[in-house]
C-alpha cells in the first residue's frame, strides 16, 4: 500500500477532464471561487459587527460608571 502517487493523481485528473470537459470544470471552478469569496466576506462582516457591538457596549458601560 503506497498511497496516492503523482501518476495516479494525473490519471484521475485526466479522467475528470474527459468526463466533464474543460468548460464545465472552468465554470465549476468559478462558482467555487465565488462561494468561497462570499463566505469570507460574510465572516468578515460578522466579525466587524461583533467588534463594533462590543466597543459600543464598552463605551456604554463607561458612561454608566461616570454618573
Swiss-Prot record:
GO CC term (a single one) = TAT protein transport complex
One MF annotation (Gene Ontology) recorded for this entry:
protein transmembrane transporter activity
Membrane topology is: Single-pass membrane protein
Q: Which residues cross the membrane?
A: 1-21
What spans are recorded as compositionally biased (Basic and acidic residues)? 54-67
Q: GO BP, one example?
A: protein transport by the Tat complex
Question: Pfam families given for it?
Answer: TatA_B_E (PF02416)
InterPro entries, per database record: TatA/B/E, TatA/E, TatE
> Which keywords accompany this UniProt record?
Cell inner membrane, Cell membrane, Membrane, Protein transport, Translocation, Transmembrane, Transmembrane helix, Transport
The record's region (Disordered) falls at 43-67
Where found, per UniProt? Cell inner membrane
Highest taxon of source: Bacteria
The function of this protein is: Part of the twin-arginine translocation (Tat) system that transports large folded proteins containing a characteristic twin-arginine motif in their signal peptide across membranes. TatE shares overlapping functions with TatA.
Report the sequence similarity comment from the record.
Belongs to the TatA/E family. TatE subfamily.
Q: Which HAMAP family match?
A: TatA_E, TatE
Protein name, as recorded: Probable Sec-independent protein translocase protein TatE
Organism encoding this protein: Erwinia tasmaniensis (strain DSM 17950 / CFBP 7177 / CIP 109463 / NCPPB 4357 / Et1/99)
